[in-house]
Amino acid sequence: MTTLHNLSYGNTPLRNEHPEIASSQIVNQTLGQFRGESVQIVSGTLQSIADMAEEVTFVFSERKELSLDKRKLSDSQARVSDVEEQVNQYLSKVPELKQKQNVSELLSLLSNSPNISLSQLKAYLEGKSEEPSEQFKMLCGLRDALKGRPELAHLLHLVEQALVSMVEEQEEAIVLGARITPEAYRESQSGVNPLQPLRDTYRDAVMGYQGINAIWSDLQKRFPNGDIDSVILFLQKALSADLQSQQSGSEREKLEIVISDLQKLKEFRSVSDQVKGFWQLFSEGITNGLRPF
């Protein structure tokens, strides 16, 4: 018989020849066989094996956490790249809208503000544009400009953080804003209905529709001097296009409800205009000989 002191044979298990021995006895002495030879492990060996197992478990857990962090970072970067591709695809169909000028001004501002925080950077972006898709586009431009400036590596890291944060918090809002921009831009060229309210109204209709009363209130608030009938038609066309490309049953139902409500508003507007026209004629006293009271 061979007696082992503080020895380990890797992952090879020892078969206990006396399974009836209580665990308290095994702590002091364990009998078994290894490669056909009887062996005896005395107390110190078991503790050594336990310590090694604990160390291996800790190292594995630490590596697993690092791997998970890297995977999360990789997933975040992939989401940023996906959103960037969509934003570029849509916004390339319209003029730059002062994009290059804004990026240049922000780059100058950041260069002179080495200790700027993430919240301050977001505030600067909002000062340049209230549209999330344009803010995201500016960040992408800043990131590309900073890549060639090794002395501003800390600012590059901050901008990349801001991109990840924006995608995590506003991915749908960014993509929807970019997607509707070409149509909203064309509609705004008449000079009657502003670009940003058009984007906001469309985005709200898709992301958080609150019913016919809410959308009517929004239209009156956002377009006090605009052509509301034209805005309703703009929304109907945009949402109908979304409906044709939508596969999900629940999403289709939501869009159908909004489109139906817009049609009701359109009809209401038509009746309302007729009533106003009739009342104007009546008040002027030229309607079939009737006179105002």
UniProtKB/Swiss-Prot annotation:
- Summarize the record's induction comment: Temperature seems to play the major role in regulation of transcription of the yopN-containing operon of pYV, whereas Ca(2+) concentration has only a moderate effect at 37 degrees C., and no effect at room temperature.
Q: Which organism is it from?
A: Yersinia enterocolitica
Gene Ontology cellular component annotations, sorted alphabetically: cell outer membrane; cell surface
Name of protein: Outer membrane protein YopN
> Where is it located?
Cell outer membrane
Q: Which gene encodes it?
A: yopN
Q: Which keywords does the record carry?
A: Calcium, Cell outer membrane, Membrane, Plasmid, Virulence
SUPFAM superfamilies per UniProt: Type III secretion system domain (SSF140591)
- Give the protein's biological function: Plays a major role in regulation of the low-calcium response. Seems to sense the calcium concentration and to transmit a signal to shut off yop transcription when the calcium concentration is high.
Annotated GO biological processes are: negative regulation of protein secretion; protein secretion by the type III secretion system
Q: What is its main location?
A: membrane
Q: What Pfam family is a match for this entry? A: HrpJ
Q: Which family does it belong to?
A: Belongs to the HrpJ/YopN family.
Entry's InterPro entries? HrpJ-like, T3SS_LcrE
